[in-house]
Structure formats: structure tokens, C-alpha cells
Amino acid sequence: MAAANQANTSHASLSGETGNSASDPLPSWRAGASKQAILGFVGQVTAEGGPDTVPPEDRVAVFDNDGTLWCEKPMPIQLDFILRRLVAMAEHDPALRTRQPWQAAYTKDYGWLNGVITKHYHGDDSEVGVLASGVLTAFAGVTVEEFEIRADQFLRTTRHPTLGRSYLACGYAPMVELLGFLEANGFDNYIASGGGRDFMRPISQQMYGIPRERVIGSSVSLVWKDGTLVHKAEVDVLDDGPEKPVRIWSRVGRRPILAVGNTNGDIPMLQFTEQPDRPSLRMLVLHDDPAREFDYVTGAEQALELAGINGWTVVSIKDDWATVF
């Protein structure tokens, strides 16, 4: 049986070679180590009667969303959604304009906001509470149905500030191909994101082919009121870091054999794939393409170091993806 570290990719790939061809299941991926790792791994776990064959019910794959399935710069997409709501609140109540995070939203002080996020990636949550105070009140009292309508409309009508495309078109084409390839080979794909569960659900099927019930993410507390569920101004689950494997197990009841992330917050999820008697594939998306997307490693330093130590597959957007969107 294969060891629990990175899967052996010596098996023949499902397309025969790593190059693109008419039968290539991953045409947006350039020939190279990352593509070969994917094809070799899937061939390994699906080979009928093979020593490392994994039954379909155990072919679970988990994916982070921000920076893994869709872009997260210059700010996470959901943060843009929330900031617009904070601006509307500050316009209605001028007293909020001198308080964070309404002040940052109203004055477009994205430096402060990005600083809070960067500190979080490095384990410093000293200002997260300040940001959360606004985030949690932004949609307090809103029903789950109304929130979904607002999120869906925002994603369909709002354009990315620098890429010039709607947010709904900011999903990575190579990752969508990968999701489809895995599903065609008997995998169940799940999103396991630090982003809001109910923010992603309206578009997960259309963008990724992932049904809403397979979306695992952060959530606010809900209360039953007047025949419906209503948002409360308090955190239920922050699905990041060590909470990711907890939530995956709670929802899925199985360890994944494939995990893809892009930041330090994804490390526990990637490590959760390790099993002594089954192969696994762990991948990190490296943002190194300023011409087509963005170039940054902030918040991923530890993950990249562990990738080198443990032999995880690092996917270079610049080198491994023939197209990005």
C-alpha cells in the first residue's frame, strides 16, 4: 500500500502523457509535475483491482475557496460584499464613520483592512474582534433567504475592481476542470473555506459543480423567528485553521484523500489527508503571476515551507496554468 505522504505518480496518467491532447481531461493545465501528480494520483486510486485503489465512497476531495477556487485579491470577495453594507450603514448613521471597521469601509482605507487579515494569517488576531464587530452586525436580523438573494445578486452583478470581470467569472478555469475530472472519476468534492457558508452556497453549483450541501464554511448563529431563520450578530463557526478538519469530519464523516489550499490556514486540512494505508494528494496554489492575476505569498509562508518538507505539490499559476479564468 502507498504511504500516507504524497501519492506515487509513477503510474501511467489517464491521458497517457502530461501534454495537452484531444483526450486531455485537464487542457488548462500545462504539462509538468503538477499535472502529472494529479493524473497519476487519480489513476492510482481508481485503477480497478490495483493495490492502492480507493472505493468511490472514500474518494473525498476538499478545497479551500478564497485564493484556491476563486481570486482573493485585492480583498476577499465576501469582504467587498460586507464593506458595501458597512458603507450603507455609515451613510445612514454618521456616528459610525469614526468607528472601525465602518471608518475603514467609508473612507476606503483598505490598508487597515488588509493589515487585519495579514495579522490573522500570522496568528495575530488582536484586531479581528474590531473587524468582527462590524461584520457581525452588517446582516443581523436578516433572514437566510434575504441574505442569499443579496449575496447571489452581488456576485452576479458586481465586477472585480482590477480584473474587469464579474465576480461570478473570477473562478479559476483549471480548478473547475480539476473538479469536473475528479467527479468523473467517482470523487465527492467539498468546499471547506474560511469564507461564509451561506455566501458561497448560491453559486457553488453553477461555478464549481459542487452542490450547496457540500459547502462547508464559516457561519453566524441563527435563530428561529416568525417562521424563518434569522441572522444573529454572533459567530457560530470560524472555519479556518484547526477548525477545518473538525468541520470536515463533522459534515463528511470521512478523511479526505485529496486537499487543495493556498494559505497557512489550510495546513490542518492538508494534514488531515494523511492516512497510513492510503495514498493522498495535497496541493497548494501559488500566486506568482502578476500579469494574469496577482503575485503574493503573504499568509502562505508556513504552508510553502511545509510543502517543501513534506513533498506537497505546489501549483504555480504562472507555470502550471495555460489559462487562469
Residue ranges and their predicted role:
Residues 74-75, 80-168, 173:
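A metal-dependent, Asp-based hydrolase signature
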Residues 58-74, 270:
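Asp-based phosphoryl-transfer active-site loop
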Residues 51-55:
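Short loop/turn motifs at secondary-structure junctions and domain boundaries
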Residues 2-5, 10-29, 33-39, 43, ...:
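C-terminal cap/substrate-recognition subdomain and adjoining C-terminal extension
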Residues 47-48, 70-72, 224-225:
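Short, solvent-exposed loop/turn elements at domain surfaces
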Residues 65-66, 89-93, 105-106, 205-206, ...:
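Short amphipathic alpha-helical patches
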